[in-house]
Protein backbone atom coordinates (compact mmCIF):
# COMPACT_ATOMS: atom_id res chain seq x y z
CA UNK A 1 0.00 0.00 0.00
CA UNK A 2 1.60 3.27 -1.13
CA UNK A 3 -0.36 5.82 0.87
CA UNK A 4 1.53 8.84 -0.46
CA UNK A 5 0.77 7.86 -4.06
CA UNK A 6 -2.86 7.26 -3.11
CA UNK A 7 -3.10 10.77 -1.62
CA UNK A 8 -1.34 12.47 -4.56
CA UNK A 9 -3.48 10.63 -7.15
CA UNK A 10 -6.68 11.56 -5.30
CA UNK A 11 -5.60 15.22 -5.10
CA UNK A 12 -4.73 15.28 -8.81
CA UNK A 13 -8.12 13.84 -9.66
CA UNK A 14 -10.16 16.41 -7.71
CA UNK A 15 -7.95 19.36 -8.71
CA UNK A 16 -8.04 18.49 -12.43
CA UNK A 17 -11.83 18.81 -12.29
CA UNK A 18 -11.47 22.30 -10.81
CA UNK A 19 -8.81 23.74 -13.15
CA UNK A 20 -8.86 21.27 -16.07
CA UNK A 21 -5.12 20.64 -15.98
CA UNK A 22 -2.65 18.47 -14.09
CA UNK A 23 -0.53 20.11 -11.42
CA UNK A 24 2.57 18.93 -9.56
CA UNK A 25 1.82 18.06 -5.95
CA UNK A 26 4.33 17.61 -3.15
CA UNK A 27 3.44 16.03 0.17
CA UNK A 28 5.19 17.48 3.21
CA UNK A 29 5.72 15.78 6.54
CA UNK A 30 3.95 17.64 9.33
CA UNK A 31 6.00 18.97 12.28
CA UNK A 32 4.00 16.78 14.71
CA UNK A 33 1.38 14.02 14.61
CA UNK A 34 -1.35 16.30 16.01
CA UNK A 35 -1.34 18.09 12.64
CA UNK A 36 -1.59 14.77 10.81
CA UNK A 37 1.08 12.80 8.99
CA UNK A 38 1.22 14.59 5.66
CA UNK A 39 0.19 18.04 4.51
CA UNK A 40 -0.19 19.95 1.22
CA UNK A 41 -0.14 23.71 0.61
CA UNK A 42 -1.64 23.40 -2.88
CA UNK A 43 -4.61 25.63 -2.01
CA UNK A 44 -2.36 28.70 -1.81
CA UNK A 45 -1.17 28.01 -5.36
CA UNK A 46 -4.76 27.50 -6.57
CA UNK A 47 -6.10 30.66 -4.88
CA UNK A 48 -4.99 33.02 -7.66
CA UNK A 49 -6.30 30.79 -10.45
CA UNK A 50 -9.65 30.09 -8.79
CA UNK A 51 -9.95 33.61 -7.32
CA UNK A 52 -10.89 32.15 -3.93
CA UNK A 53 -9.58 32.24 -0.39
CA UNK A 54 -7.18 29.27 0.23
CA UNK A 55 -9.20 28.33 3.35
CA UNK A 56 -12.39 27.92 1.30
CA UNK A 57 -10.56 25.93 -1.41
CA UNK A 58 -9.11 23.62 1.28
CA UNK A 59 -12.54 23.00 2.84
CA UNK A 60 -14.14 22.26 -0.56
CA UNK A 61 -11.34 19.89 -1.58
CA UNK A 62 -11.47 18.08 1.77
CA UNK A 63 -15.19 17.33 1.28
CA UNK A 64 -14.45 15.81 -2.13
CA UNK A 65 -11.42 13.87 -0.88
CA UNK A 66 -13.38 12.39 2.02
CA UNK A 67 -15.97 11.06 -0.42
CA UNK A 68 -13.20 9.18 -2.27
CA UNK A 69 -12.31 6.99 0.75
CA UNK A 70 -8.56 7.08 0.04
CA UNK A 71 -7.03 3.74 0.98
CA UNK A 72 -4.82 4.00 4.07
CA UNK A 73 -6.12 7.44 5.08
CA UNK A 74 -8.12 7.64 8.31
CA UNK A 75 -8.96 11.35 8.42
CA UNK A 76 -8.55 14.53 6.34
CA UNK A 77 -8.73 18.07 7.76
CA UNK A 78 -8.61 21.58 6.34
CA UNK A 79 -6.52 23.87 8.57
CA UNK A 80 -5.95 27.52 7.56
CA UNK A 81 -5.63 26.71 3.86
CA UNK A 82 -3.59 23.54 4.36
CA UNK A 83 -4.95 20.03 3.86
CA UNK A 84 -3.73 17.57 6.50
CA UNK A 85 -3.93 13.80 6.09
CA UNK A 86 -4.01 11.33 8.98
CA UNK A 87 -2.84 7.78 8.25
CA UNK A 88 -4.75 4.68 9.27
CA UNK A 89 -1.73 3.26 11.08
CA UNK A 90 -3.24 -0.13 11.86
CA UNK A 91 -3.73 -0.96 8.17
CA UNK A 92 -0.60 0.89 7.10
CA UNK A 93 1.69 -0.84 9.62
CA UNK A 94 0.31 -4.29 8.83
CA UNK A 95 0.80 -3.87 5.06
CA UNK A 96 4.23 -2.25 5.37
CA UNK A 97 5.64 -4.83 7.80
CA UNK A 98 4.38 -7.65 5.59
CA UNK A 99 6.01 -6.00 2.55
CA UNK A 100 9.38 -5.64 4.33
CA UNK A 101 9.13 -9.21 5.64
CA UNK A 102 8.41 -10.56 2.16
CA UNK A 103 11.10 -8.55 0.34
CA UNK A 104 13.76 -8.70 3.06
CA UNK A 105 16.95 -6.93 1.97
CA UNK A 106 15.33 -6.22 -1.41
CA UNK A 107 12.85 -3.84 0.26
CA UNK A 108 13.37 -0.43 -1.37
CA UNK A 109 15.11 -1.88 -4.44
CA UNK A 110 14.21 -0.09 -7.69
CA UNK A 111 12.96 -1.75 -10.86
CA UNK A 112 15.64 -2.86 -13.32
CA UNK A 113 16.44 -0.02 -15.72
CA UNK A 114 17.99 -0.53 -19.14
CA UNK A 115 20.40 2.34 -18.47
CA UNK A 116 24.17 1.82 -18.29
CA UNK A 117 26.21 4.14 -16.07
CA UNK A 118 29.99 4.34 -16.02
CA UNK A 119 31.10 5.90 -12.76
CA UNK A 120 34.72 7.00 -12.41
CA UNK A 121 36.02 7.60 -8.91
CA UNK A 122 39.19 7.63 -6.79
CA UNK A 123 41.63 7.76 -9.78
CA UNK A 124 44.55 8.92 -7.59
CA UNK A 125 47.92 9.29 -9.28
CA UNK A 126 50.03 6.14 -8.78
CA UNK A 127 52.92 8.03 -7.15
CA UNK A 128 52.05 7.10 -3.57
CA UNK A 129 49.31 5.83 -1.26
CA UNK A 130 45.79 7.20 -1.06
CA UNK A 131 45.57 10.12 1.36
CA UNK A 132 42.40 11.27 3.08
CA UNK A 133 41.51 13.62 0.21
CA UNK A 134 41.39 10.61 -2.12
CA UNK A 135 39.44 8.78 0.58
CA UNK A 136 36.50 11.18 0.31
CA UNK A 137 36.41 10.61 -3.45
CA UNK A 138 36.59 6.82 -3.06
CA UNK A 139 33.83 6.63 -0.44
CA UNK A 140 31.45 8.96 -2.28
CA UNK A 141 32.04 6.97 -5.48
CA UNK A 142 31.68 3.52 -3.93
CA UNK A 143 28.53 4.40 -1.95
CA UNK A 144 26.99 5.98 -5.04
CA UNK A 145 27.76 2.87 -7.10
CA UNK A 146 25.99 0.67 -4.55
CA UNK A 147 22.95 2.98 -4.35
CA UNK A 148 22.62 3.34 -8.14
CA UNK A 149 22.81 -0.44 -8.60
CA UNK A 150 20.22 -0.97 -5.86
CA UNK A 151 17.97 1.56 -7.59
CA UNK A 152 18.13 -0.54 -10.76
CA UNK A 153 20.90 0.93 -12.93
CA UNK A 154 23.60 -1.16 -14.61
CA UNK A 155 26.77 0.40 -13.13
CA UNK A 156 30.42 -0.08 -14.07
CA UNK A 157 33.14 1.62 -12.02
CA UNK A 158 36.36 2.96 -13.50
CA UNK A 159 39.68 3.96 -11.97
CA UNK A 160 41.45 6.20 -14.50
CA UNK A 161 45.18 5.55 -14.13
CA UNK A 162 47.41 8.54 -14.81
CA UNK A 163 50.51 6.64 -15.93
CA UNK A 164 51.91 9.47 -18.07
CA UNK A 165 53.27 12.89 -17.33
CA UNK A 166 55.99 14.28 -15.11
CA UNK A 167 54.97 12.60 -11.85
CA UNK A 168 55.37 9.07 -13.19
CA UNK A 169 58.59 9.99 -14.99
CA UNK A 170 59.91 11.19 -11.62
CA UNK A 171 58.98 7.87 -10.00
CA UNK A 172 60.63 5.87 -12.81
CA UNK A 173 63.85 7.92 -12.58
CA UNK A 174 63.70 7.76 -8.77
CA UNK A 175 63.55 3.95 -8.88
CA UNK A 176 66.61 3.95 -11.17
CA UNK A 177 68.57 6.10 -8.71
CA UNK A 178 67.32 4.94 -5.31
CA UNK A 179 65.45 1.66 -5.84
CA UNK A 180 62.47 0.71 -3.64
CA UNK A 181 62.24 -0.30 0.00
CA UNK A 182 60.90 -3.87 -0.30
CA UNK A 183 60.01 -3.91 3.42
CA UNK A 184 57.37 -1.23 2.93
CA UNK A 185 53.84 -1.53 1.55
CA UNK A 186 54.26 -1.00 -2.19
CA UNK A 187 52.48 2.35 -2.60
CA UNK A 188 54.33 3.75 0.44
CA UNK A 189 57.66 2.60 -1.03
CA UNK A 190 56.79 4.44 -4.26
CA UNK A 191 55.95 7.59 -2.26
CA UNK A 192 59.28 7.41 -0.42
CA UNK A 193 61.14 7.24 -3.75
CA UNK A 194 59.00 10.09 -5.13
CA UNK A 195 59.94 12.32 -2.20
CA UNK A 196 63.63 11.41 -2.58
CA UNK A 197 63.71 12.25 -6.30
CA UNK A 198 62.01 15.61 -5.73
CA UNK A 199 64.62 16.50 -3.11
CA UNK A 200 67.40 15.24 -5.40
CA UNK A 201 66.21 17.43 -8.32
CA UNK A 202 66.10 20.50 -6.11
CA UNK A 203 69.78 19.90 -5.38
CA UNK A 204 70.62 18.84 -8.99
CA UNK A 205 68.38 20.97 -11.31
CA UNK A 206 70.56 20.06 -14.30
CA UNK A 207 69.08 16.52 -14.12
CA UNK A 208 65.60 17.85 -15.00
CA UNK A 209 66.36 17.25 -18.69
CA UNK A 210 66.51 13.51 -17.99
CA UNK A 211 62.90 13.61 -16.74
CA UNK A 212 61.74 15.37 -19.93
CA UNK A 213 63.69 12.83 -21.99
CA UNK A 214 61.97 9.95 -20.17
CA UNK A 215 58.56 11.49 -20.89
CA UNK A 216 59.40 11.94 -24.57
CA UNK A 217 60.70 8.39 -24.95
CA UNK A 218 57.66 6.90 -23.22
CA UNK A 219 55.22 8.80 -25.42
CA UNK A 220 57.20 7.98 -28.59
CA UNK A 221 57.05 4.27 -27.73
CA UNK A 222 53.32 4.47 -27.08
CA UNK A 223 52.62 6.36 -30.32
CA UNK A 224 54.49 3.65 -32.21
CA UNK A 225 52.69 0.97 -30.18
CA UNK A 226 56.03 -0.41 -29.02
CA UNK A 227 56.94 -2.35 -25.91
CA UNK A 228 60.51 -1.59 -24.89
CA UNK A 229 62.66 -1.02 -21.83
CA UNK A 230 61.09 2.40 -21.14
CA UNK A 231 57.49 1.17 -21.34
CA UNK A 232 58.39 -1.76 -19.06
CA UNK A 233 59.88 0.62 -16.48
CA UNK A 234 56.72 2.77 -16.47
CA UNK A 235 54.45 -0.27 -16.30
CA UNK A 236 56.45 -1.73 -13.42
CA UNK A 237 56.30 1.53 -11.42
CA UNK A 238 52.58 2.06 -12.03
CA UNK A 239 51.61 -1.54 -11.24
CA UNK A 240 53.79 -1.51 -8.12
CA UNK A 241 51.92 1.56 -6.82
CA UNK A 242 48.54 0.17 -7.89
CA UNK A 243 49.16 -3.08 -5.99
CA UNK A 244 49.39 -1.06 -2.79
CA UNK A 245 46.45 1.19 -3.68
CA UNK A 246 44.26 -1.85 -4.48
CA UNK A 247 45.14 -3.36 -1.10
CA UNK A 248 44.00 -0.15 0.62
CA UNK A 249 40.78 -0.10 -1.42
CA UNK A 250 40.11 -3.73 -0.47
CA UNK A 251 40.53 -2.82 3.21
CA UNK A 252 37.98 -0.05 2.65
CA UNK A 253 35.55 -2.56 1.08
CA UNK A 254 35.92 -0.90 -2.35
CA UNK A 255 36.41 -2.65 -5.68
CA UNK A 256 36.66 -1.09 -9.14
CA UNK A 257 35.44 -3.01 -12.18
CA UNK A 258 38.02 -1.58 -14.58
CA UNK A 259 41.39 0.20 -14.36
CA UNK A 260 41.74 2.32 -17.51
CA UNK A 261 45.29 3.43 -18.32
CA UNK A 262 45.68 6.93 -19.71
CA UNK A 263 48.48 5.73 -22.02
CA UNK A 264 46.09 3.35 -23.82
CA UNK A 265 44.64 6.37 -25.68
CA UNK A 266 48.07 7.38 -26.97
CA UNK A 267 48.84 3.77 -27.88
CA UNK A 268 45.60 3.28 -29.87
CA UNK A 269 45.95 6.61 -31.71
CA UNK A 270 42.82 8.15 -30.19
CA UNK A 271 44.67 11.15 -28.71
CA UNK A 272 46.06 12.06 -32.14
CA UNK A 273 42.55 11.80 -33.62
CA UNK A 274 41.16 14.08 -30.87
CA UNK A 275 43.76 16.76 -31.68
CA UNK A 276 43.02 16.43 -35.43
CA UNK A 277 39.26 16.71 -34.89
CA UNK A 278 39.65 19.73 -32.62
CA UNK A 279 41.90 21.36 -35.27
CA UNK A 280 39.03 20.97 -37.75
CA UNK A 281 36.75 23.07 -35.52
CA UNK A 282 38.86 26.17 -36.23
CA UNK A 283 39.12 26.83 -32.50
CA UNK A 284 42.76 25.75 -32.07
CA UNK A 285 45.43 28.46 -31.84
CA UNK A 286 49.11 27.60 -32.33
CA UNK A 287 51.56 29.73 -30.39
CA UNK A 288 54.23 28.14 -28.20
CA UNK A 289 51.70 25.35 -27.66
CA UNK A 290 48.45 24.20 -29.25
CA UNK A 291 45.57 25.91 -27.41
CA UNK A 292 41.80 25.50 -27.67
CA UNK A 293 39.70 28.67 -27.60
CA UNK A 294 36.62 27.99 -25.45
CA UNK A 295 35.32 31.58 -25.21
CA UNK A 296 32.07 30.51 -26.95
CA UNK A 297 31.38 28.45 -23.81
CA UNK A 298 32.07 31.36 -21.44
CA UNK A 299 35.54 30.03 -20.55
CA UNK A 300 38.15 32.77 -20.97
CA UNK A 301 41.19 30.62 -20.20
CA UNK A 302 42.46 28.66 -23.18
CA UNK A 303 42.86 24.88 -22.91
CA UNK A 304 46.38 23.68 -23.71
CA UNK A 305 46.07 20.57 -25.90
CA UNK A 306 49.65 19.75 -26.88
CA UNK A 307 53.19 21.00 -26.58
CA UNK A 308 54.82 22.75 -29.56
CA UNK A 309 56.60 19.50 -30.44
CA UNK A 310 53.19 17.81 -30.74
CA UNK A 311 53.40 15.63 -27.62
CA UNK A 312 50.08 15.30 -25.81
CA UNK A 313 49.05 16.63 -22.42
CA UNK A 314 46.78 15.27 -19.70
CA UNK A 315 43.86 17.38 -21.01
CA UNK A 316 43.88 15.75 -24.48
CA UNK A 317 44.17 12.27 -23.04
CA UNK A 318 41.29 13.08 -20.69
CA UNK A 319 39.11 14.13 -23.64
CA UNK A 320 39.98 10.86 -25.44
CA UNK A 321 39.09 8.84 -22.33
CA UNK A 322 35.73 10.61 -22.02
CA UNK A 323 34.88 10.12 -25.69
CA UNK A 324 35.59 6.41 -25.31
CA UNK A 325 33.79 6.06 -21.98
CA UNK A 326 30.71 8.03 -23.00
CA UNK A 327 30.35 5.96 -26.19
CA UNK A 328 29.96 2.84 -24.01
CA UNK A 329 27.25 4.06 -21.63
CA UNK A 330 24.06 6.09 -21.34
CA UNK A 331 25.33 8.20 -18.43
CA UNK A 332 28.90 8.98 -17.39
CA UNK A 333 29.58 10.23 -13.87
CA UNK A 334 32.91 11.63 -12.61
CA UNK A 335 33.73 12.22 -8.94
CA UNK A 336 36.27 15.05 -8.71
CA UNK A 337 37.77 17.41 -6.16
CA UNK A 338 36.52 20.99 -6.24
CA UNK A 339 39.97 22.10 -7.50
CA UNK A 340 39.17 20.35 -10.82
CA UNK A 341 36.13 22.55 -11.62
CA UNK A 342 37.75 24.61 -14.38
CA UNK A 343 39.43 21.56 -15.96
CA UNK A 344 36.13 19.65 -15.92
CA UNK A 345 34.31 22.56 -17.59
CA UNK A 346 37.02 22.71 -20.26
CA UNK A 347 36.74 18.98 -20.96
CA UNK A 348 32.94 19.30 -21.21
CA UNK A 349 33.28 22.21 -23.66
CA UNK A 350 35.77 20.27 -25.80
CA UNK A 351 33.44 17.26 -25.84
CA UNK A 352 30.56 19.47 -26.98
CA UNK A 353 32.75 20.83 -29.80
CA UNK A 354 33.29 17.22 -30.88
CA UNK A 355 29.54 16.52 -30.79
CA UNK A 356 29.75 14.21 -27.77
CA UNK A 357 27.52 13.99 -24.73
CA UNK A 358 29.14 15.16 -21.50
CA UNK A 359 29.57 13.55 -18.09
CA UNK A 360 27.78 14.48 -14.90
CA UNK A 361 30.35 15.66 -12.37
CA UNK A 362 30.10 15.39 -8.60
CA UNK A 363 32.53 17.84 -7.01
CA UNK A 364 33.58 17.42 -3.41
CA UNK A 365 35.33 19.90 -1.15
CA UNK A 366 38.46 19.17 0.82
CA UNK A 367 38.71 17.00 3.89
CA UNK A 368 41.29 17.57 6.60
CA UNK A 369 42.27 16.38 10.04
CA UNK A 370 42.54 18.87 12.91
CA UNK A 371 46.28 18.01 13.02
CA UNK A 372 47.00 19.82 9.74
CA UNK A 373 47.28 19.60 5.96
CA UNK A 374 48.50 16.98 3.48
CA UNK A 375 51.23 17.12 0.85
CA UNK A 376 52.71 14.22 -1.14
CA UNK A 377 55.56 16.21 -2.66
CA UNK A 378 57.63 16.44 0.51
CA UNK A 379 56.17 13.38 2.20
CA UNK A 380 53.87 15.20 4.64
CA UNK A 381 50.50 13.51 4.29
CA UNK A 382 48.03 11.42 6.25
CA UNK A 383 47.58 8.20 4.33
CA UNK A 384 44.29 6.31 4.24
CA UNK A 385 46.15 3.28 5.63
CA UNK A 386 47.20 5.28 8.70
CA UNK A 387 43.70 6.67 9.15
CA UNK A 388 42.10 3.22 8.97
CA UNK A 389 44.71 1.75 11.32
CA UNK A 390 44.03 4.56 13.79
CA UNK A 391 40.26 4.04 13.43
CA UNK A 392 40.54 0.33 14.27
CA UNK A 393 42.87 1.07 17.20
CA UNK A 394 40.47 3.67 18.62
CA UNK A 395 37.51 1.35 17.98
CA UNK A 396 39.26 -1.36 20.04
CA UNK A 397 39.75 1.13 22.88
CA UNK A 398 36.04 2.09 22.75
CA UNK A 399 35.06 -1.60 22.71
CA UNK A 400 37.22 -2.29 25.79
CA UNK A 401 35.74 0.71 27.61
CA UNK A 402 32.20 -0.47 26.91
CA UNK A 403 32.77 -4.18 27.45
CA UNK A 404 32.11 -4.86 23.76
CA UNK A 405 33.82 -7.76 21.98
CA UNK A 406 37.11 -6.57 20.49
CA UNK A 407 36.79 -8.73 17.34
CA UNK A 408 34.25 -6.31 15.86
CA UNK A 409 36.70 -3.38 16.05
CA UNK A 410 37.41 -3.62 12.29
CA UNK A 411 33.68 -3.29 11.43
CA UNK A 412 33.31 -0.38 13.85
CA UNK A 413 36.51 1.35 12.71
CA UNK A 414 35.79 0.98 8.99
CA UNK A 415 32.15 1.96 9.53
CA UNK A 416 33.27 5.06 11.44
CA UNK A 417 35.54 6.17 8.60
CA UNK A 418 33.11 5.42 5.76
CA UNK A 419 30.01 6.80 7.47
CA UNK A 420 31.63 9.97 8.81
CA UNK A 421 32.67 10.88 5.26
CA UNK A 422 29.45 9.72 3.55
CA UNK A 423 27.17 11.73 5.88
CA UNK A 424 28.49 15.14 4.80
CA UNK A 425 27.19 16.74 1.60
CA UNK A 426 30.08 16.76 -0.93
CA UNK A 427 29.76 20.55 -1.42
CA UNK A 428 30.82 21.14 2.19
CA UNK A 429 34.46 21.12 3.31
CA UNK A 430 34.87 18.77 6.26
CA UNK A 431 37.21 18.19 9.16
CA UNK A 432 37.46 14.52 10.12
CA UNK A 433 37.00 14.42 13.91
CA UNK A 434 37.46 11.16 15.81
CA UNK A 435 34.99 12.09 18.54
CA UNK A 436 32.23 12.32 15.89
CA UNK A 437 33.30 9.32 13.81
CA UNK A 438 33.41 6.92 16.78
CA UNK A 439 30.43 8.38 18.65
CA UNK A 440 28.30 5.55 20.11
CA UNK A 441 25.74 7.99 21.54
CA UNK A 442 24.55 10.49 18.90
CA UNK A 443 26.05 10.96 15.43
CA UNK A 444 28.58 8.24 14.61
CA UNK A 445 28.20 5.01 12.71
CA UNK A 446 28.66 2.96 15.93
CA UNK A 447 25.37 4.51 17.11
CA UNK A 448 23.59 3.08 14.03
CA UNK A 449 25.42 -0.26 14.25
CA UNK A 450 24.45 -0.45 17.93
CA UNK A 451 20.76 0.05 17.05
CA UNK A 452 21.06 -2.86 14.60
CA UNK A 453 22.81 -5.04 17.21
CA UNK A 454 20.05 -4.19 19.70
CA UNK A 455 17.44 -5.38 17.16
CA UNK A 456 19.37 -8.66 16.79
CA UNK A 457 19.53 -9.07 20.57
CA UNK A 458 15.76 -8.51 21.01
CA UNK A 459 14.94 -10.99 18.23
CA UNK A 460 17.29 -13.58 19.77
CA UNK A 461 15.66 -13.14 23.19
CA UNK A 462 12.21 -13.53 21.60
CA UNK A 463 13.35 -16.73 19.87
CA UNK A 464 14.63 -18.12 23.20
CA UNK A 465 11.28 -17.29 24.82
CA UNK A 466 9.30 -18.80 21.94
CA UNK A 467 7.65 -15.47 21.03
CA UNK A 468 6.98 -15.04 17.30
CA UNK A 469 6.74 -11.78 15.36
CA UNK A 470 3.48 -11.07 13.53
CA UNK A 471 1.99 -7.93 11.95
CA UNK A 472 -1.19 -7.83 14.05
CA UNK A 473 -1.38 -4.09 14.88
CA UNK A 474 -4.92 -4.27 16.29
CA UNK A 475 -4.34 -1.75 19.08
CA UNK A 476 -3.85 2.01 19.46
CA UNK A 477 -0.27 2.66 18.40
CA UNK A 478 2.00 4.98 20.37
CA UNK A 479 3.53 8.09 18.78
CA UNK A 480 6.95 6.33 18.90
CA UNK A 481 5.58 3.35 16.94
CA UNK A 482 3.96 5.65 14.39
CA UNK A 483 7.16 7.64 13.94
CA UNK A 484 9.22 4.47 13.40
CA UNK A 485 6.68 3.03 10.92
CA UNK A 486 6.77 6.26 8.91
CA UNK A 487 10.57 6.23 8.90
CA UNK A 488 10.63 2.66 7.56
CA UNK A 489 8.17 3.60 4.82
CA UNK A 490 10.41 6.52 3.80
CA UNK A 491 13.31 4.21 2.91
CA UNK A 492 12.00 3.72 -0.67
CA UNK A 493 11.84 7.49 -1.23
CA UNK A 494 15.30 7.96 0.28
CA UNK A 495 16.81 5.43 -2.14
CA UNK A 496 15.10 7.18 -5.07
CA UNK A 497 16.24 10.64 -3.94
CA UNK A 498 19.83 9.52 -3.23
CA UNK A 499 20.11 7.76 -6.60
CA UNK A 500 18.49 10.47 -8.71
CA UNK A 501 20.30 13.38 -7.02
CA UNK A 502 23.59 11.39 -6.86
CA UNK A 503 23.91 12.35 -3.19
CA UNK A 504 24.92 9.60 -0.77
CA UNK A 505 24.66 11.78 2.36
CA UNK A 506 20.85 11.65 2.05
CA UNK A 507 20.87 7.92 2.81
CA UNK A 508 23.55 8.28 5.51
CA UNK A 509 21.56 10.94 7.39
CA UNK A 510 18.33 8.96 7.03
CA UNK A 511 19.94 5.93 8.72
CA UNK A 512 20.97 8.07 11.68
CA UNK A 513 17.39 9.38 12.04
CA UNK A 514 16.03 5.82 11.74
CA UNK A 515 18.37 4.64 14.52
CA UNK A 516 17.22 7.57 16.70
CA UNK A 517 13.55 6.75 16.02
CA UNK A 518 14.20 3.11 16.93
CA UNK A 519 15.89 4.11 20.19
CA UNK A 520 12.89 6.28 21.14
CA UNK A 521 10.60 3.35 20.36
CA UNK A 522 12.80 0.98 22.41
CA UNK A 523 12.88 3.36 25.39
CA UNK A 524 9.10 3.94 25.47
CA UNK A 525 7.48 0.77 24.13
CA UNK A 526 8.03 -2.43 26.17
CA UNK A 527 8.41 -5.43 23.86
CA UNK A 528 8.95 -8.72 25.69
CA UNK A 529 7.86 -7.83 29.22
CA UNK A 530 5.28 -10.18 30.79
CA UNK A 531 2.70 -7.40 31.21
CA UNK A 532 2.65 -6.68 27.45
CA UNK A 533 -0.36 -8.07 25.56
CA UNK A 534 0.54 -10.94 23.17
CA UNK A 535 -0.67 -9.13 20.03
CA UNK A 536 1.33 -6.03 21.01
CA UNK A 537 4.43 -8.20 21.62
CA UNK A 538 4.11 -9.85 18.20
CA UNK A 539 3.53 -6.53 16.43
CA UNK A 540 6.43 -4.76 18.14
CA UNK A 541 8.71 -7.69 17.38
CA UNK A 542 7.73 -7.39 13.73
CA UNK A 543 8.62 -3.69 13.92
CA UNK A 544 12.03 -4.59 15.41
CA UNK A 545 12.62 -7.15 12.65
CA UNK A 546 11.71 -4.63 9.93
CA UNK A 547 14.01 -2.00 11.48
CA UNK A 548 16.86 -4.51 11.54
CA UNK A 549 16.29 -5.27 7.84
CA UNK A 550 16.30 -1.62 6.76
CA UNK A 551 19.33 -0.69 8.89
CA UNK A 552 21.20 -3.68 7.48
CA UNK A 553 20.29 -2.84 3.86
CA UNK A 554 21.07 0.85 4.31
CA UNK A 555 24.46 0.28 5.92
CA UNK A 556 25.36 -2.30 3.25
CA UNK A 557 24.65 0.40 0.62
CA UNK A 558 27.22 2.56 2.42
CA UNK A 559 29.68 -0.36 2.36
CA UNK A 560 29.42 -0.88 6.13
CA UNK A 561 29.11 -4.19 7.99
CA UNK A 562 26.54 -4.71 10.75
CA UNK A 563 27.79 -6.68 13.76
CA UNK A 564 25.06 -8.87 15.27
CA UNK A 565 26.41 -8.20 18.76
CA UNK A 566 27.95 -5.10 20.29
Swiss-Prot record:
GO terms for molecular function: arginine-tRNA ligase activity; ATP binding. Gene3D superfamilies: Arginyl tRNA synthetase N-terminal domain, HUPs, Isoleucyl-tRNA Synthetase, Domain 1. GO terms for cellular component: cytoplasm. Pfam families: Arg_tRNA_synt_N, DALR_1, tRNA-synt_1d. Its EC number is 6.1.1.19. SMART domains: Arg_tRNA_synt_N (SM01016), DALR_1 (SM00836). It is an enzyme of class 6 (ligase). GO terms for biological process: arginyl-tRNA aminoacylation. The keyword Protein biosynthesis applies. It is found in: Cytoplasm. It catalyses: tRNA(Arg) + L-arginine + ATP = L-arginyl-tRNA(Arg) + AMP + diphosphate. Keywords: Aminoacyl-tRNA synthetase, ATP-binding, Cytoplasm, Ligase, Nucleotide-binding, Protein biosynthesis. Belongs to the class-I aminoacyl-tRNA synthetase family. This is Arginine--tRNA ligase. The lineage of its organism: Archaea, Methanobacteriati, Methanobacteriota, Methanomada group, Methanococci.
Amino acid sequence: MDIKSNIINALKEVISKEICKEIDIKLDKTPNLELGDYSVNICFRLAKELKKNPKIIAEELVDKLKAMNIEGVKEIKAVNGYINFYIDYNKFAKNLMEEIDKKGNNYGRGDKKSIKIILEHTSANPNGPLHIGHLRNAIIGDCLKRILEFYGYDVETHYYVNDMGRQMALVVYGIELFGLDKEKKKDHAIAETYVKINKYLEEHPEEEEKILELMRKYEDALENNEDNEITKKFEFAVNYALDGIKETLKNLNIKHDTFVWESSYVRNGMVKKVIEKLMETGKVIKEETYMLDLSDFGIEKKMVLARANGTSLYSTRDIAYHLDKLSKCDIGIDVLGADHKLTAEMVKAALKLLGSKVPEVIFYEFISLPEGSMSTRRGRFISTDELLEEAIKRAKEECNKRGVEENIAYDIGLGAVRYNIARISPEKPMVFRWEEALDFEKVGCPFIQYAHARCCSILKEAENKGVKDEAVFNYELTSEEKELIKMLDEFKDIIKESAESRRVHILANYLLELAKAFNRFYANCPILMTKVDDDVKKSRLKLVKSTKTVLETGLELLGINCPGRM
